[in-house]
Every structure is written in C-alpha cells, then in structure tokens.
Regions:
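Linear, non-domain "peripheral" regions
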Residues: 4-5, 18-117, 306-309, 318-321, ...
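Repeated scaffold domains used in trafficking and secretory/extracellular systems
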Residues: 275-287, 322-348, 378-391
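Extracellular modular ligand-binding repeats in secreted and cell-surface proteins
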Residues: 418-460
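Cellulosome-associated attachment modules in secreted, modular CAZymes
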Residues: 19-23, 458-518
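Hydrophobic core
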Residues: 9, 13-17, 182
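Hydrophobic/aromatic-rich core segments of domains that either
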Residues: 173-244
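Residue position within the beta-strands of beta-propeller blades
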Residues: 293-296, 355-356, 395-398
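Secondary-structure boundary elements
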Residues: 100-163
C-alpha cells in the first residue's frame, strides 16, 4: 500500500484580502471540479481565489483524489506552491508532474485500450452483480500478484498504468484497476485501506447497496514456506470468497483489520442476499447465449456447470474425483493419489469454452452441445496443473508431482499448432427468390469459418437438381438417396423439391414422380 498522503510544499505564502478580479462569476464549477479538471489536464497553476475554500478542505479533497481517482496516477501530490489569504482561504496551487502532458495522453489511451478488452465483452443487459463478477474474474485470471515487487519497497506497481503494462502488481494495483473499470461502466467503487495489514481492496455499490470486494485475495498464489515458488500464480484459477461481503464478513480473516475509506465516510457494507452459486466457482465465469459457465469442485457440483440465474445450476460434465474425506473434487493420478483441487482454467473464444482436466484439454461447443478433446500432446507422465488462454494461444502447466516440482510449460496456437477440423455445412443465410444465401463450415476447435459457399437464389434453382449440374435425371435421384442414407453429405439445394427448408423422403417421392413424367 501507499503510505498516507505526503504533500510536499516548497512555499506557503499569505496575502492580504485585497480586491481581485472575479473569476467565479464566469466559472460555475465548484472548487472540487476545478481542481480535478486542472490535474486531469496537467495544469501547473490553479487560481482558486474566488472559490473561498479553506486550505484544510482543499487538502482533504486532494487526499481524496490521491486515493480514489486512479486515472490521476501520474500525479504524486507534489505541490510546488500553496498560497492562502488572511482568512485561511486558498488562493492558488502550483503543481509539478513527473512527465509531459503528451506522454500522459499516450498513456491514457493505452489504459483505455487495455481496459476496453474486458469492457467490450460486457453485455449492457447484464446485472451489475454480473458485470462486477466478470471484471473481478478477468483481473484474477489475466494478472498476478508479485511478491518480488512487494518485498522490494519502491518497486511496487501501485498504479493502473504499470499494472496493465506488466500484468503484475500488488493489492493496490488490483484495487485501482478494478475501481477504474467499474466506474467506466457506471458502477461506483472506492479504495479501502487497512494500514494495520498494509492492504487495500474495494467497496462496490450494487443496486444501491455497498459490498466489499478483494480481487487480490481472490487471485490465488502459490506460497509454500521454505520453498521457492516455480510460478506465483495458480494459472487460470479464481476464487470468489472475497466477492460481495459485508463489513463483518470481510474482517473474519487477518488481513482486513481496522479498515477505512480515504476521503469517504458513511459507507456501510451489508451481506449479499442475491443468487450466488458463483461463490464455489474455481474458475472465471463466462456467458454464452443464455447460460453462465464455470468449473466448480464443491461437493454438490463437481464439474463444468451452467446456470441462467446463479441459483439453479446444471452439471454438464463431471470432472475429477470426489474425495469423501475432503468433501470436494480433485485430480486423480494413475497411481491412485489425489490432488485436492481443480488445477484448471476456463476460457471462452468465439463462443467455445476451453478447459482442462488432469489429463485432457477440452473444447465445448455450447451451440451444438459437443465436447471434443483438443489435440495437444500432454508431456509423458505429467498431469495438467493450470490453463491460460490469450486469443488463440493456449498455455498450460504440467507436472508429474505438483506445482513446486518438475513443472513444464507448453504453448499451442489454434489454427497453427492445432489444425482446423471442419464441421458439416451449416446454412447461415437462407436464400430468397432474389437473393443468394450462404453456407459455411466452422472449425470444431476455434469456431473460425474455414470454408464458405454461396447458395443460389431460389429463382435460379432448378428443382430436382441434386448434384448442381442444372440437369434433372436419374443421377440426381441416386445422389438424393445416398444423402438420405447418410452416405453422401453433399446435396444441392435443388433437392428440396417442396422448398420447405428440409430435404427428406417427401422430396425423394416428388423427384421420382417428376422423373416419371407426373
């Protein structure tokens, strides 16, 4: 965490209350809006003489900005000059910055572009709980807590810029970034501080009520006393134990003692009473169509789950082995030993879900309800201990023992290392009398379109032409019979004799009659 506000003043000047030209009449901004706008635009001198704001009030607001406005990361509260009049009212402030405005604008664009990656995936029709949950999981999966930075004071990535660049940081990095993204989509949030535990997290307002959210603590890290970690992050895993908690719930552990919200008073967090099957999810949650999906190794779940409302859940694939003594599912090795956890990630690409078990990496096509194993060569004698995915790039960890010993990392790219596997033809646009339609073949793995064909407009179709040669004869009859028998999967649209959108035995009978001259 940052230390408490430290404002450096090079000079404080007192001036008499003599008459000055009025600016406030021309400027309807409050002093808070004026200060925020000035820092946001990297102004070096702020004239506040007609706002009649007390110095203490202004400095209280500056402290609020320092902690609660992460987009002002470039401002370290270095005040070069503070001038007040004989009434203790602030006249002007002079600031210094550690970079140029041009550099800041480039950085600001980078921050917006990086956070757009998650914002663009959020449906405006989701509830605020679902939006906050999705962002919580995105941060947990794509970023990691960095103990190296924490152990070296002065090197921590506290601000959102370096956190988004390095994908690593400390608690304040998570909290600042979470707060920034939430506010961009219209959800209010503040930074919470426990100086006693040197820790920071957020409060979030959902449907008018406030809750604690600690993304840092929900991003599990590998930490075994006396042993150097191979990989700090449990790759792909997400916890939800610190999502939407009350004041009394957040202090039940030893890392949230005597907390306060810098610059903000009166917020009381209460217990969440909505549907919350996500609490036992061990991966990020993903929305495809009308369902949310996640992995859950709790006793009453044990696999890939889906739900429409986070109340009524359905297991669509059992994963792992249920160990009665522990009360949850884990990895089962060939020698009979059990790893009491899902060391797994769940990711969405093109509407397909990718996840791992101890021995396989699967892709689930929710549209067709099809599971397929992804053709990746698991290292001999090793089991999967984590999965991550960035676009088409799949990264995994594998080990014969655990995450502390003999860990290897592998990387595969869909469409490159994993070749496309085509589906059957699917019509994505039906032809009309005057307009062509289109049919495509998708890849089973990545859902990319790997082949396209135009379906001629109905006015140009020769009814009975099953093989596309624009002639009608017994060859078309044979092609149609083979298609209906499942032997031939290719058929021309002309075989749909009654134009009902389906090719079946009725069309076969009609074609026979046509060839017979009826």
């Amino acid at each position: 965490m940052k230390k408490l506000l430290s404002i450096v003043l090079s000079i404080i000047i007192f001036i008499g209350a003599f008459a000055l030209p009025s600016l406030a009449q021309e400027n309807e901004l409050t002093y808070k809006e004026r200060i925020y706008t000035a820092i946001s635009n990297m102004e070096t001198l702020i004239d506040l003489r007609d706002y009649k704001v007390k110095v203490d009030d202004a400095f209280t607001y500056l402290e609020y900005l320092f902690y609660q406005q992460p987009e002002l990361y470039y401002w370290d509260i270095l005040i070069e000059e503070c001038t007040q009049n004989s009434n203790g009212e602030l006249v002007k402030l002079a600031f210094t910055y550690d970079r140029t405005k041009e550099q800041m604008l480039i950085e600001r664009m980078f921050i917006e572009n990086q956070t757009n990656k998650v914002i663009e995936k959020i449906d405006k029709n989701w509830s605020d709980t679902e939006k906050a949950l999705y962002i919580h999981d995105w941060l947990s999966v794509n970023f990691m807590y960095d103990y190296d930075l924490f152990e070296e004071p002065g090197t921590e990535n506290h601000d959102i810029l370096n956190f988004l660049k390095d994908k690593r940081g400390v608690c304040e990095s998570y909290a600042n970034t979470y707060m920034y993204i939430l506010r961009r989509i219209g959800i209010n949030s503040y930074l919470v501080v426990s100086e006693e535990d040197n820790h920071g997290w957020n409060v979030v307002q959902i449907d008018g009520k406030w809750y604690h959210v600690d993304v840092t603590n929900d991003d599990p890290i590998l930490s075994v006393e006396g042993q150097p970690p191979y990989h700090y992050d449990y790759v792909g895993e997400v916890e939800h134990e610190k999502f939407l908690l009350s004041d009394s719930e957040i202090i039940e552990d030893d890392s949230h003692d005597n907390f306060f919200i810098p610059g903000v008073e009166g917020i009381v967090c209460e217990s969440y009473t909505g549907n919350d099957s996500w609490r036992t999810a061990t991966t990020a949650v993903h929305k495809i169509g009308e369902y949310w999906y996640y992995l859950d190794n709790s006793k009453d779940a044990g696999g890939l789950m889906r739900t429409k409302d986070f109340e009524n859940t359905e297991r669509i694939m059992e994963i792992g082995y249920y160990y009665e003594s522990w009360g949850f599912y884990g990895w089962l090795k060939d020698d009979g030993t059990i790893q009491g956890n899902y060391y797994a990630g769940l990711f969405e690409y093109n509407g397909h879900l990718f996840f791992n078990t101890e021995k396989e990496i699967y892709v689930y096509d929710s549209h067709h309800n099809i599971f397929k194993t992804v053709p990746i060569d698991r290292p001999q004698g090793k089991y999967y201990y984590g999965l991550n995915m960035d676009g088409k790039t799949i990264t995994y960890l594998a080990s014969a023992d655990d995450l502390l010993h003999n860990v290897v990392e592998g990387e595969y790219v869909l469409g490159v290392d994993i070749k496309h596997l085509s589906t059957d033809w699917e019509i994505i646009k039906n032809p009309t009398e005057t307009e062509d339609g289109e049919k495509v073949k998708f890849c089973y793995y990545c859902a990319d379109i790997v082949e396209r064909q135009t379906i001629p407009a109905l006015s140009s179709v020769v009814l009975g032409d099953a093989n596309g040669d624009r002639d009608i004869n017994t060859t078309d009859l044979a092609v149609l019979k083979l298609y209906l028998a499942g032997i031939n999967k290719e058929i021309g649209i002309g075989a749909d004799m009654d134009r009902d959108g389906a090719i079946n035995t009725k069309d076969l009978a009609t074609l026979k009659l046509k060839l017979a001259g009826f």
